[in-house]
Regions:
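Non-catalytic DNA-recognition/assembly elements of restriction-modification systems
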Residues: 681, 685-741
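Active-site-adjacent bridging/hinge elements
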Residues: 34-47, 126-141, 161, 206-218, ...
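Short, hydrophobic/amphipathic alpha-helical patches that form generic packing surfaces
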Residues: 56-75, 135, 240-247, 520-524, ...
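Signature of N6-adenine DNA methyltransferases within the class I
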Residues: 154-155, 185, 192, 235-236, ...
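Structural motif
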Residues: 47-65, 121-125, 325-327, 508-515, ...
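Polybasic, glycine- and aromatic-enriched phosphate-binding surface used to engage nucleic acids
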Residues: 332, 438-698
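Charged, often flexible domain-edge or linker segments that flank or initiate folded functional domains
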Residues: 1-100, 145-279, 335, 354, ...
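Class I S-adenosyl-L-methionine
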Residues: 71-72, 76-162, 521, 534, ...
Length: 741
């Protein structure tokens, strides 16, 4: 008895850290460098950014294993399978024509290792034997750059279940980004399982279909289970997995064309992929590449831009795009293109996607219209499964969800939305309902609320009476603007810049500057719930009224030492990308997000990109070197200017309440860049402070108590319960509704 042929065993035997793989890739690398095979130039058209021979050698090594695996599992030799065009034009067989003894020895060694495994019997459940090996061999940064993630079998099965895919070969299925064929193999397994049950019913004790039945079954599978991919290595692996799934059913003498095609499903959508007419599919499934627009190659962005525009996926103004709204994902375009070009009317699409598509404000607006262009067909979303808490992809923190939609019908809101979370044994599933947070704007972020909650969206959501702002932004030069105030010195304050901060390394210097432009700095880590304590200082050389840098003539005359300090960093400051793009005619030390609100004496401050709202009241700081000064939050914090201490504490209490935290989490991405941004107040009905309202005064008193308890290291749970009850009253919530939230 040999070893069991399983995906994890192959990855363990031939993984990146094994000695045979390290030696094998080195042998292939040397051979490729010496021979410069024509296949190398062709391969570089698919991987233009690859330098040297390492990746080409690694791909060739993987391809060698694929060939040997097919031979071992199916009994088909290289001459048979590849001679019959099973893998089409093969970029990775170049080593066969390079007569080098080390290459032959490597092939023999790999064949001997593969021979240690027993081929799986026909009818064995099997699966994608190659995906895990690929993910072990190819470096994770490269896989993630290409948007490639390992799809676990249970998630594959879930996607097929969503489209109610069973085993009907009259139902045509496509994976337009099939990778190594995970979804294709899973579909084939379902078809074969039913065929074997039928065979057993017709002839008890025999699960194998008759030869003529097997041939016809394979023909039907070839016609109904199809894959595309633009990576030639993925196409090769998918064809191998496809063939292995059909082992024992195909006559060895058959000439076959596995229906997995080398094809860019997006850019080549209008071109035929096989002989004869391209019939639309009943189902489209898969795990499309997750690649941000900014990370796409420049040429691909240019080539695909008309499609983004055709489908209305670019919905932002230039200003909105500059501030992060252009962080679109290629999966958006894949879904729309696949639905448009490959899916029949009334057909269903189910795909693994990033959950941010449903709540990312700006970047996802066009996608959430669920229409193929301004006058195109509708895409009706039937269900979303949110698996963020499960983290199906263990080697990445991507926010995972699955999407099910039907072509040709508008989306009916609310959409069933299921949140999965780890449980004892099987994961827990909690039912929610999703709808646009702005009913008049179908592209607005989805608002999620527990199914069955009596409170309507209209009662919960409303615009704030307050305006929030980002903190002061140095434009990537924190190491210049952020300083440590050391001591009083003749003519000013001796400072030392925090050289290790910011996107660019700067020289550490000590210098005397005028105290008037120096303020206590609140960094992200300085702010927590009911506590905000500055840990450094910031030089604020911005005119808060004009919102540009202080006039340079004025700065040089009135604050000569501060001007001299910034002048020594002039090259760096003038080289900031944001400065060159937006303020190159302004003083070179100009900052961003600075206005009168920045220096307001009393503020409420919270951190964005957090997992919940953690707000604190910030009042003037008694600085030992500067005297009384307002604290300045950095740009990763958000602030509200307040006119009094009571007003600030009232607002702080409301923002820290469970009601507000529910509302923020219900329409934005916890921990994401869009969480807790100023725009959250577009949907949080934070009323203007009213000193005549008993509840407002009680909330202010509760916030003061919570600040005091936090400073003393005492828990605030009891006072927080009172805050939640009072805020619930402001929203008109019943006790049961408040508990649900």
């Amino acid at each position: 008895m040999g070893k069991e042929l399983r995906a994890e065993n192959l990855a363990e035997q031939f993984g990146a850290d094994t000695s045979i793989t390290k030696r094998g890739v080195a042998v292939l690398c040397r051979a490729a460098a010496a021979a410069e095979p024509p296949a190398l130039a062709n391969w570089k058209t698919f991987f233009p950014d690859a330098d040297g021979y390492d990746l080409f050698a690694l791909h060739t090594y993987y391809a060698m294993l694929v060939r040997l695996l097919v031979e071992r599992c199916c009994g088909i030799g290289a001459d048979d399978s590849f001679g019959n065009g099973l893998f089409g034009d093969d970029l990775f067989s170049w080593y066969a024509s390079v007569r080098r003894e080390p290459l032959q020895r490597l092939n023999n060694q790999l064949a001997a290792k593969m021979a240690e495994y027993d081929p799986p019997l026909p009818g064995h459940p099997g699966g994608d034997l190659l995906q895990q090996l690929y993910h072990d061999l190819v470096p994770r940064p490269l896989r993630h750059e290409l948007g490639e993630y390992y799809t676990p079998d249970w998630l594959t099965q879930h996607v097929l279940d969503q489209i109610a895919y069973t085993s009907d070969t009259n139902v045509r299925l496509l994976d337009p980004a099939c990778g190594s064929g995970t979804f294709l193999v899973a579909a084939i397994r379902r078809i074969l399982a039913t065929a074997r049950l039928d065979a057993a019913e017709q002839q008890p004790g025999n699960e194998a279909p008759a030869p003529e039945t097997s041939t016809e079954l394979c023909r039907k599978i070839f016609a109904s289970v199809v894959g595309f991919d633009l990576n030639p290595l993925a196409v090769m692996a998918a064809k191998a997995n496809y063939l292995i799934a059909l082992r024992g059913l195909l006559p060895k003498s058959a000439t076959v064309e596995i229906p997995v095609y080398l094809r860019d499903s997006i850019l080549a959508a209008d071109r035929p992929y096989a002989d004869g007419p391209d019939e639309p599919f009943d189902c489209v499934v898969g795990n499309p590449p997750w690649i941000a627009w900014d990370n796409l190659p420049t040429e691909y962005r240019r080539a695909s831009l008309p499609l983004w525009q055709r489908y209305g996926l670019f919905s932002l103004s230039g200003t909105q795009g500059r501030h992060g709204g252009s962080k679109k994902d290629l999966a958006m375009l894949m879904i729309y293109t696949a639905a448009d070009r490959y899916l029949r009317d009334g057909g269903r699409l189910a795909m693994v996607v990033t959950q941010t598509l449903f709540q990312n404000k700006g970047a996802g607006d066009g996608f959430r219209r669920f229409r193929l262009g301004p006058e195109g067909q509708w895409l009706g979303v039937l269900r979303v499964d949110d698996m963020v808490a499960l983290r199906p992809f263990h080697d990445t923190a991507n926010r995972t969800a699955t999407l099910l939609l039907e072509k040709g019908t508008p989306t009916q809101y609310p959409v069933p939305y299921v949140k999965w979370s780890p449980g004892d044994g099987a994961p827990r599933q909690l039912a929610y309902e999703a709808e646009p947070i702005e009913p008049s704007n179908p592209g607005s972020p989805w608002f999620l609320r527990p199914a069955g909650l009596k409170t309507t969206r209209e009662r919960l959501v409303g615009r704030s009476d307050y305006t929030a702002h980002l903190g002061a932004n140095s434009g990537g030069a924190n190491g210049v603007y952020w300083v440590e105030a050391l001591e009083r010195s003749r003519g000013g304050i001796l400072i030392r810049n925090l050289a290790g901060r910011g996107k660019r390394a700067v020289e550490e210097v000590c210098r005397v500057v005028e105290p008037e432009l120096l303020y206590p700095l609140l960094r992200w880590g300085d702010v927590s719930r009911y506590r905000a304590t500055p840990s450094a200082h910031i030089l604020l050389v911005q005119d808060v009224v004009t919102r540009t840098g202080i006039d340079e003539t004025l700065l040089r005359r009135r604050y000569a030492q501060t001007h001299a300090y910034f002048e020594q960093f002039g090259v760096l400051l003038r080289g900031r990308a944001a400065y060159r793009r937006y303020q190159d005619e302004k003083p070179f030390y100009s900052m961003y997000n600075v206005g009168t609100y920045t220096v307001a004496p009393i503020k409420v401050v919270w951190r964005r990109m957090d997992r919940r709202i953690n707000a604190a009241v910030v009042e003037p700081v008694e600085d030992p070197l500067l005297g009384t000064r307002p604290a300045i939050p950095q740009e990763t914090c958000v602030l509200i200017e307040c006119g009094s201490s009571d007003e600030a504490h009232y607002a702080c209490a409301v923002l820290n309440s469970s009601v507000v935290n529910f509302l923020v989490a219900a329409h934005s991405i916890s921990g994401g860049k869009g969480f807790g941004t100023p725009s959250m107040l577009d949907y949080i009905r934070l009323q203007r402070f009213d000193p005549a309202d008993r509840r407002h005064l009680e909330l202010a008193a509760c916030s003061r108590q919570a600040h005091r308890l936090t400073a003393e290291g005492v828990a605030t749970a009891i006072v927080q319960q009172l805050i939640d009850r009072l805020v619930g009253e402001l929203w008109g919530l019943e006790e049961s509704e408040l508990r649900t939230l």
